[in-house]
């Protein structure tokens, strides 16, 4: 799951319309985007403010049960990545946490300020 700092890059990439991006920006909408197994992006939730978006990503990750690994890809927001690391380490001690930069193709659609929180569940 990802959240974005701005809708501008989704509009530039043709993923949403210019009017939707403008209205989303005016109202402070921060989408939560689900990355499907095939790599496609799907809207999952919407919240107002970045702080609420970060908290929502943590909620989603913590609903996944016992974890094997945690991945935090980000686009130029190391302070948010460290916040996620601290929160997830406290909740899931001993689970490896990897902070990475978002790859260029995905970053071109998501823009700077994008951050994700991906988890791998332990096999049952």
Where are these regions (language model features)?
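Mixed-charge interfacial surface used for oligomerization/domain docking
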Residues: 1-124
């Amino acid at each position: 799951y990802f959240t974005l700092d701005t809708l501008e890059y989704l509009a530039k990439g043709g993923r949403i319309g210019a009017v939707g991006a403008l209205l989303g920006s005016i109202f402070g909408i921060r989408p939560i985007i689900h990355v499907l197994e095939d790599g496609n992006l799907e809207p999952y939730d919407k919240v107002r403010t970045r702080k609420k978006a970060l908290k929502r990503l943590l909620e989603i990750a913590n609903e996944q049960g016992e974890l094997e690994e945690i991945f935090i890809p980000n686009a130029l927001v190391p302070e948010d990545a460290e916040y996620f690391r601290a929160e997830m380490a406290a909740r899931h001690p001993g689970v490896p946490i990897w902070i990475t930069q978002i790859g260029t193709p995905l970053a071109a659609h998501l823009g700077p300020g994008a951050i994700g929180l991906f988890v791998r569940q332990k096999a049952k």
